[in-house]
């Protein structure tokens, strides 16, 4: 079983207490609690939990608003906790980057799979984003090399092959 650091955000103190107890029984560490969306976002940024467990309806910023900000910055996996399971709410949760969805009252046997799946999806998304950034850098480098090769070819009236050879020789001699 995986153990996660979890941020709990719910405006109901009794629900937060029950969730903390349940999570700790399951071997997780509750690293912070918030009673509104603004504090949930702020705590997620500072504490960097594995998972943020957010209620939908909270003051100052909803759980969906906090989820969107947390997801946009790739801070942690977000699991939404709500009493609502209607299609529009699920659509909003999906748009906000929520990776799992639990309907209140949360049952013990549902929470562990939701946390594990959300964390796995978060790791996958982070890896894909990292790969995309590396590919983007590679494309930019290839474009820069292509343009430099073109400049060499025009200035020295040489073939593409000769321009490539000179660039490679220069890179080797300068230790690149």
Label the predicted regions:
Residues 13-32:
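Two-component/phosphorelay signaling modules centered on CheY-like receiver
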Residues 36-39, 60-65:
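Acidic catalytic/metal-coordinating carboxylates
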Residues 49, 58:
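Receiver (REC) domain active-site loop signature in two-component systems and cognate sites
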Residues 55, 82:
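Active-site residues of response regulator receiver
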Residues 88, 106-115:
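C-terminal output helix
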Residues 94-96, 111-123:
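Receiver (REC) domain switch/output surface
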Residues 123-124, 130-176:
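C-terminal output/effector regions of signal-responsive regulators
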């Amino acid at each position: 079983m995986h153990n996660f650091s979890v941020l709990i955000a719910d405006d109901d103190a009794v629900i937060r207490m029950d969730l903390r107890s349940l999570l700790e029984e399951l071997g997780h560490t509750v690293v912070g609690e918030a009673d509104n969306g603004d504090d949930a976002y702020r705590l997620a940024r500072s504490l960097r939990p594995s998972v943020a467990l957010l209620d939908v309806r909270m003051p100052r910023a909803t759980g969906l608003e906090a989820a969107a900000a947390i997801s946009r910055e790739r801070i942690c996996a977000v699991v939404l906790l709500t009493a609502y399971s209607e299609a529009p709410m699920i659509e909003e949760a999906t748009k906000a980057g929520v990776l799992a969805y639990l309907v209140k009252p949360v049952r013990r046997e549902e929470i562990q799979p939701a946390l594990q799946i959300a964390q796995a999806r978060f790791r996958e998304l982070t890896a894909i984003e990292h790969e995309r950034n590396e590919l983007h850098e590679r494309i930019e480098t290839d474009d820069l090399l292509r343009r430099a090769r073109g400049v060499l070819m025009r200035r020295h009236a040489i073939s593409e092959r000769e321009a490539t050879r000179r660039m490679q020789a220069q890179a080797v001699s300068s230790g690149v």
